[in-house]
Amino acid sequence: MMLRCCFSILIGVLSAQAAVDEAAFWKTVEPFLDTYCLKCHDNETQKGKLSLEGISPSVADGNLEMWRMVFERLHFGEMPPKKKKQPNPAERAAVLAWIRGELLKTQEPGALAEEKLTEPQFGNYVDHTALFGKRRSHVTPAPPRLWRLRPAIYNTTMPRLGERITGLANGLNAVDGSDFKDFAAAYFLDEAAAAPLLGNAKKIAAAMTAPNAKDRSLKTLVVDAPPTAEQVAEGIRTAFRKIVGRAPTAEELGRFGAFHQAASATGGHVAAANALLTAILMQPEVLYRMELGTGEPDEHGRVRLSPREVAYALSYALDDRPVEMFLKAAADGKLATTEDVAAAVRERLADDTLLQELNPRVLQFFREYFHYPFAREVFKDAPKGGKHEPDWLVRDLETTVRDVLRADKAVLSTLLTTRRFYVNAQYKSVKRKGVQLQPTHTKWWPYQTAFNLAPDWRWGLDRQPVEFPEGERAGVLTHPAWLAAWSGNFDNHPVQRGKWIRTHLLGGTVPDVPIGVDARVPDAEHITFRNRLKQVTAAAECWRCHRKMDPLGVVFERYDHYGRYQRRDAGQPVDATGLIDRTGVPELDGKHVSGPAEMMAELSKSTHVEQVFVRHAFRYFMGRNETLGDTNTLQAAHDAYRKSSGSFRALTESLLASDSFLMRQSPKQAKD
């Protein structure tokens, strides 16, 4: 009887909690919709085929998707349109609070659009003017976090534990798409991912105790005679040093010792040894980056990462394995202060080698930022009279990028405007001669036609890099590798190219393509692609978004989808004019450009573009989007970049020695 009574009370409480707050709807939300929304979204007008007239306040009763869309548009500032009457912040906040509360009552996963703010493609929704406006009293860092290892770290470190074992399963996924891959919020370990990792751990454990294994203290655990308690303890210490990278605590030593003893009683000491190593290999500290912080919170409620946490954070920011230099510095007490960290990062970044491989994550930033390696994934037939080799194009472009990183001056501006590119040339290690510039392939003709070089053009190392005529090439965005990566199989893709400029250089936002939209451009050989695109995007409901992308992307109609410079398209002179607009930056807005070279020249001079570039570098190295609490970090990084004449090393040093990187909110503050 008591149980039935309690159950009835619980149902009543839940029902009360789930009831729609209709009073607040009629008092706050309905007048808001009437004032700011219904002029365009009533039953008669229905802009975007959306009517909010008579919408029910019952979010869970058939209106979930519509309310979720309204919340998203209001939350991200996309509605009302900028030229329409705007609600004040208090009005917007009140309506958002009501919708948020009703969405939460549905208990539907992903009901809140604000969850998207942790995803890399939504970083630009943080107000740029506020980030680079008035500085704050202090940095408010992210909460403590467990950051699942990216596949490259796992694939580099795990095989070494098993004496370079092969055949390990891939249990760690990476997100698809053109955004940064290693975002902490994007990954977790579930049962499906843990199963192959457990299989890997068993294989590695067996290899660590195999007869040909090097470590005697681990092999002692599987010899004929059962090990003594001290031998088990020594095996645990060795396993922790090799696998976790530290000595076990007293609690861990006792716990794993008891585990081995229980496993031995059940299956014998050999099986127990493998189970012991498998358990250590599956510890969260092995599969996650631990960034919890230590010590007493400061006056702002922040705690600093421990020296060991800093060492691993720096290692994985610049490399795909623990860097001995950072681990030693932590052990020697030389990562205790911000100045210590800055000095260590500065020393590590001093890489003047041709390949620029001391810190592979630096080059990887530019791969992921520009996304040019994707050219390898875009299938194309060979052009008439030419050759399309996307892998060669990517390698050629990376030779230029390596040069720019080694020079480390005006890095962004140079990458956006350079006319000097390599053609069939890359840095290679030559036996007994070291790294030298060598041909990518010996049988390369007529590969050079991708760069509009004549079929009889004479190739030579002494002619590298090739300086192209002014107006023909201008930076990475006019290189065939980037153009091919941001194209279709048979045509250019000015929409995606324009979106890249809007988001990666101008810091703007573009909504997702609405469900049900047919985004195909009609085929018509006698009409230029620019005009064919205009036919399908000119409608008002389409142009609202396409005006942010198309005027920026159509300048690249100067090139065909292979990346070759062209003067005619569909038998007509190419129109490569464009417009930089809707940026909120007076010196850029309304700027008409004659083609890609002029656009790149304008963008490369912009302080705003530099700041957006800094924001992307922040996301890459921090593994998260920036918040207003990171204002000081971003401004300091931009200052470092400018004062160093555009040094990416100085920018990286500033980020990795910042409070945003080294500090975490204390658990209490994070909870509050």
Residue ranges with predicted function:
Residues L221-P226, I243, T294-G301, Y312, ...:
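Active-site-adjacent structural elements in folded domains
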